[in-house]
Structures are given as C-alpha cells and as structure tokens.
Amino acid sequence: MAPRAEKKPAEKKPAAEKPVEEKSKAEKAPAEKKPKAGKKLPKEAGAGGDKKKKMKKKSVETYKIYIFKVLKQVHPDIGISSKAMGIMNSFINDIFEKLASESSKLARYNKKPTITSREIQTAVRLVLPGELAKHAVSEGTKAVTKFTSS
C-alpha cells in the first residue's frame, strides 16, 4: 500500500501547479481522502492483527533438544547443522506418525477403544525393520518399567 500512497502525492503536485484546475482539485481531494481513510482502517486492523499474532503465538513442539542430547551422549565432540536437525525432526515426526497409525489400526482390528503399550509394541515390530525393532522394544520396555516404578 505504501507505493500507492507515494503515487498519489505525485498526482497531487501536477494538479497544484495548474491553478485553473483548483475546482477539480477540490472535488478530487475528498475522493482521495476517502481511500486514505480506507487505508487507515487496515493499518489499525493491522495493529490489532499484531495483538492477535501475539495472542496466537504458540510454541512449536520439536525434538531438537532431545536429538542434540542423544548426539552428545553418542558423540560429544560432533555438532549438527540446523538443516540436518530439521531433517532429523521431520524423520522422528514421520516415524511417530506411522507408529500411531499402526497402533490405531491394531486397536480397531481387536475392537478395543484404547491403545495400550501392547499395541505400541506390536506397531514398533511391524513398522521398524529387524534388529532396530528389537532394540526399540527393549528400550521402550525399559522406559515403561522405569515410569511405572517411580
């Protein structure tokens, strides 16, 4: 909208230079002021929009912190780029989505309304290949045991 505002004063200057067209200038002035008033409304709404943006500001849940912690446990001297971190975050989201979907299907097949650790475990065995599934199941079992004991 700023480029339009710059164009309008440029149009007014030639009209001001011609004294013969003062009446037409006076007639055009209110017409030009009305769009300006219209422009002020979106600016005010924009200011209100900023408040709404502040209110709508939600924290985006990512696994970046946890990926970094695991990386430092495995390789303390190695870093990770932000692009690689984004890829890892997308990868984890994708795997969790697949596990949730498979768990949901298993619960529906067995006509059960809840997804239990058993459905999750079976979904892990179905989604992840071979040795990776075995390690995931053992780590998951260990985590559930630790959670229930504390």
From Swiss-Prot:
Residues recorded with modification N6-acetyllysine: K7, K12, K28, K33, K39, K40
Q: What is the lineage of its organism?
A: Eukaryota, Viridiplantae, Streptophyta, Embryophyta, Tracheophyta
One GO term describing the cellular component: chloroplast stroma
- Glycyl lysine isopeptide (Lys-Gly) (interchain with G-Cter in ubiquitin) crosslink, residue number(s): K146
Transmembrane intervals: none
Any idea which residues bear N-methylalanine here? A2
Cellular location(s): Nucleus; Chromosome
Top-rank taxon of the source lineage equals: Eukaryota
Record carries keyword DNA-binding: yes
Concerning SMART domains, the annotation shows: H2B
Q: Which residues does this entry mark as bearing N6,N6-dimethyllysine?
A: K13
**Name of the protein:** Histone H2B.6
- Tell me what PTMs the record reports for this protein: Can be acetylated to form H2BK6ac, H2BK11ac, H2BK22ac, H2BK27ac H2BK33ac and H2BK34ac.
Q: Which residues carry this modification: N,N,N-trimethylalanine?
A: A2
Q: Where is the composition biased (Basic and acidic residues)?
A: 1-35
Q: Which UniProt keywords apply?
A: Acetylation, Chromosome, DNA-binding, Isopeptide bond, Methylation, Nucleosome core, Nucleus, Ubl conjugation
Family indicated by similarity: Belongs to the histone H2B family.
Any single GO molecular-function term of the entry would be: DNA binding
Region Disordered, as annotated, extends over 1-58
Residues with the modification N,N-dimethylalanine, per the entry, are: A2
Function per UniProt: Core component of nucleosome. Nucleosomes wrap and compact DNA into chromatin, limiting DNA accessibility to the cellular machineries which require DNA as a template. Histones thereby play a central role in transcription regulation, DNA repair, DNA replication and chromosomal stability. DNA accessibility is regulated via a complex set of post-translational modifications of histones, also called histone code, and nucleosome remodeling.
Against InterPro entries, the record matches this protein to: Histone-fold, Histone_H2A/H2B/H3, Histone_H2B, HISTONE_H2B_site
Look up keyword Acetylation and say if it applies: yes
> Matching CDD domains, A to Z?
HFD_H2B (cd22910)
